[in-house]
Amino acid sequence: MIEFEPKYITFDCYGTLTKFRMADMTREMFGNVLQGDDLEKLVAFYAGYRRDEVLGAWKPYRDVVVNALRRACKRMNVEFNEVEAEKIYTAVPTWGPHPDVPEGLSRLAKKYKLVILSNASNNQIQSNVDKLGAPFHAVFTAEQAQSYKPRMQGFEYMFDQLNCNPEDVLHVSSSLRYDLMTAHDLGIKHKAFVKRGHEPSTPYYQYYEVNDIPHLAAELGL
């Protein structure tokens, strides 16, 4: 059980709540030119370059998505098509939640104020949020904060907007590298790692582990 009453439960969205399909779309897009291990290398390089693209000054999410794929294609010596790359970006608002999410969030929303902090575009995120099946107190984007996670600025922006402190929230994510390592460094004591399979558990960062969002609700007594 989680023996803590947060003022807010703050969530990462893409990957944690929304089923993030960039790897799937990359496989579909390049499956005719790469196979097996080479295709998976491209997928992995694309993920890595996306992380690298968000570490500097803020830029539109479209540029993050497209630039990272351009770099991954160069690394794998395959042809890059910017029009095709933009299709990945434009698909983002069509993606819905992991199957467990609506039930779990609905249970949590009966008691807690739910908040999203997402590496998202302002003009895309609401479409994803509308598919989650529960009300949110606030939704904050990297575009609003002018900074992407894992940089700290987005978290600091969220705390300022909510008029709260790191100690007041339970932050929930399926990503150590984008969220929970930064949350640890910011002094967010209460964190939950949702085991979606993108990253291995790293207990050093001191979080609760849950299998899905209903499991999180159960750990909070709901």
Q: Predicted segments — roles?
A:
Residues 2-99:
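N-terminal helical cap/lid subdomain that shapes the substrate entry/recognition surface
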Residues 1-8, 37, 106, 112-222:
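Asp-based, Mg2+/Mn2+-dependent phosphohydrolase catalytic module
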Residues 64, 68, 100, 104, ...:
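Charged catalytic carboxylate motif
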